[in-house]
Swiss-Prot record:
Catalyzes the NADPH-dependent reduction of 7-cyano-7-deazaguanine (preQ0) to 7-aminomethyl-7-deazaguanine (preQ1). It is found in: Cytoplasm. It is an enzyme of class 1 (oxidoreductase). GO terms for molecular function: preQ1 synthase activity. It holds the Pfam family QueF. Its EC number is 1.7.1.13. One of its GO terms (cellular component) is cytoplasm. Belongs to the GTP cyclohydrolase I family. QueF type 1 subfamily. It catalyses: 7-aminomethyl-7-carbaguanine + 2 NADP(+) = 7-cyano-7-deazaguanine + 2 NADPH + 3 H(+). Signal peptide: none annotated. Its main location: cytoplasm. This is NADPH-dependent 7-cyano-7-deazaguanine reductase. One of its GO terms (biological process) is tRNA modification.
Amino acid sequence: MTKTDVSGLSQLGTKVDLPQNPEEAVLERVPSGHGGTDFVVRFTAPEFTSLCPMTGQPDFAHLVIDYVPDGWLVESKSLKLFLHSFRNHGAFHEDCTIDIAKRLVSLLSPKWLRIGAYWYPRGGIPIDVFWQTGSPPEGVWLPDQGVPTYRGRG
């Protein structure tokens, strides 16, 4: 078993105030320790919130982020704080989704990353946003994201 170097982390194991916006949030990474092995890391945020940039009303989504590391893992507390920083941030669903994915790609330079954002209906229309960096590495197991299509009462 490899020991992960956490000496450069500023948030793990300490009390950290919630960032007020995504630009203020600090994403951190740790070495993977499993170079040469392709595997999928999944983060699920079933209660993601942001604000509508027009009305200021809350928007809710179920996020699923999958990635294949290439040397780096996102530190989960920093990811949690980053995602929570959208709580008071006004942006359209598409912008929130793509901005989250691009920040992670910039930080980690993963072999592959995808995000599925399953937004709850606004005005009677659910908006689902999907993005990925390209084709996943051959041979990795990619489970279904497991979020059913919105059906309302039906």
